[in-house]
Amino acid sequence: MIRGEPQEFRDMDNNDLAAMVKAVGNRFGYEDATASYSPMNEFKVKWTRTYKWISLDISDYLDDAPEDVMECLLTTIFRRIAGEDSVEYGQPLVDWLRSEGFVRSKQSLFVRRFRGLSLSTEGKHRDLTDSYRRLIDKGLVEEDPLTYIGWAIYPSTKIVGKTSAIMKVIAISEVLDSEAVSEDVLDYCLYSQLARVKLGFNPGPKRRGIEYDALLDKYPDRRVMDRKLECMNMHI
């Protein structure tokens, strides 16, 4: 498994962002529109607004995004604020977030900010690399050297894992690092999170439960695995 090495990030250019958000904001009727990049654990945009004034707080994972990508992001955000709840992000942004270059340049920073994520696949009793290899050997997943897999050191006792599909980072609950948990169950739990990575960034607000469920159905004896997790008071 390849893990991203720390990358050098240029200083955030809030001046360029301010000029762009002002122009886009004016198109949507805002007399005063401001924005800045901020360090965030997740990829997201927050805003505060009144009738004619708006201020955006944008994740610094976007601080080096090309102009067309930021134009796409801002236009979509303003459209959603205006009530177009179903509008999807445009292709320039989607392509950029799904690119190998984005993951390579941002993943290590994301991992450093991810509280409770182990720096190794090796646990006390299980090694997630072994689980990943079994899934590959069975043809259930394709190997992706960009995917980062670790243990959630401070895990929920009920959820098997947490995943960032954008950053390709998977944290498996440390509760599953036990000899009492079968390899099949552990493999299924890892598969469930790899399925989220496979779906990738969701460009729209609509949930993709049907697509996700279809991927889970490809796992042999999925219903048996679900029942075993229920007996452990855990779920996907």
Where do the model's predicted regions map?
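Active-site-proximal or metal-binding-adjacent scaffold patches in catalytic folds
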Residues: 1-187, 197-236
